[in-house]
Amino acid sequence: MSRIDRALVSLDWEEHFENTSQRMLPHVILDHCPLLLEASVVRRGQSAFKFENMWLQAEGFVDRVQQWWIGYSFTGSPSYILAQKLKALNADLKKWNREVFSDLAFRKKNLLTKLMGLDAREESVGLSNEDQHRRIQLKGDIEHLASLEEISWRQKSRALFVKEGDNNTRFFHRLVNSRRNANLILYEDEANVRSQLVLFYQGLYEENEVWRPTMDGLDFACIEEKERLSLEKEFSKEEVFQVLKEMEGDKAPSPNGFTMAFFHKCCSIVEKDVMDFFDYFHRHSVFERSLNASFLTLIPKKCNAVNIKDFCSISLVGSVYKVLANRLRAVLDNLISESQNSFVGGRQILDSVLIANECLDSRLKSILSGVVCKLDIEKAYDHVNWEALFYLLGRMGFGSKWRGWIRVCVTSVRFSVLVNGSPEGFFGNSRGLRQGDPLSQLLFLLIMEVLSRLLKKTEECNLIRGFQVGSVNSVGVRISHMLFADDTILFVMLLEISFCP
């Protein structure tokens, strides 16, 4: 059903009224619906700490961080020490920002007022050499603050496609407002909605199935010995910090609040503690639970989302998963069948689209009957059974150390739900993978490989027969299914059923 009733606002309106919502009221007589345009202040809870990338441009910032970092003294495992140092730095940065860096907009407005005063004096009585020098300095300070403002708005806007130096603060500001309005959750009873969100995700991530089918009758590919050794080798400084450099500095921070830009700039300061953490994790397969905390960010899957199921949850996680994901991606090609092309190195998801289109074309040109069925698995990542995953890793030949790493990464997660920018709740889970985690999307490919192998086994037993691509009179290629992450397309011919002996 198309919408013909809309309320249009100007860009100036959007800048003055950031939290604007539109509601359609019931229509009684006319075909058109009355529209209610509400411009109100949204009640937001206390936001979590977020590192501001503009702080990195402050004079002497790195030296200041180094002094703080050296002064921290904690005892415990390397992961605990790293977590506590980041927490202490969090507090020092907030205090420094409040007392020294201060409010950027206020500072800029104050400088502009002084500059306007000098301009007015120049028109009336003229400026002395000292005043002219002061005006040049004021202009430089204002330009510097404008640059910091641009960095801040770019970070908030998530406009990663805009390169450094594209000085368009107004553009970034509008993007931030647009994101806030699109991701905003309006509610009548704040406490009730927050508690219901937490209860929903606690139930979603709780394993309540008492029985799951086994995979004993399916054949899986196995990794080679050299691949197993490559997965479990020690973490080098070059490997870890290359991953950090490749991660976008403006991307959303993890629950500790620090962006990748902080680690890029302060690499030499945190290097030892980060590598101690990775070395300890390599030897003992454990790390501090607080480093594995995750925010669930609710992203609307459609316009006018009103039900909680209309939102998909995306997790914001740390860089350790990126290191493991890079290693796992290197061995996936031999483990994943050709029916899956997403997230596998050397394969293109467009190939699956072309193959699916060829299957449809071949069926339309023939006189044979068939069925095309698209399966969309609801909350697929969230329903993954852990024991099935660990069993599958063993069947595919992964070593005990690697399986231990995956186990601790998957099972030690703690979640908080972000509601209008404010975290709510703190709970664990007993099933599921985190959508948005670079490692989880690869582990999910292995899970979906079970479905692919099951469909292949079904075809071998003549329970189904795929579409033949190519000439009907030639041998051609038979395609029974294509998998696109958590979406599956089946291509099945109509035939008489015969069962496996």
Positions of the model-derived regions?
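Short, P/G- and charge-enriched loop/turn segments at secondary-structure junctions
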Residues: Q22-L25
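Arg/Lys-enriched, amphipathic patches
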Residues: L35-Y187, E207, R212, R228-K233, ...
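Non-catalytic, usually N-terminal nucleic-acid engagement modules in DNA/RNA processing proteins
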Residues: H32
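Short helix-loop capping/hinge motifs at secondary-structure junctions, enriched
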Residues: E14-E18, V42-G45
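Metal-dependent phosphoesterases centered on the DNase I-like endonuclease/exonuclease/phosphatase
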Residues: M1-E15, F49
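Nucleotidyl polymerases of mobile genetic elements and RNA viruses
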Residues: R3, L8-V9, H27-I29, L37, ...
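Short Pro/Gly-enriched beta-strand edge/turn motifs at strand-loop
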Residues: F17-T20, F278
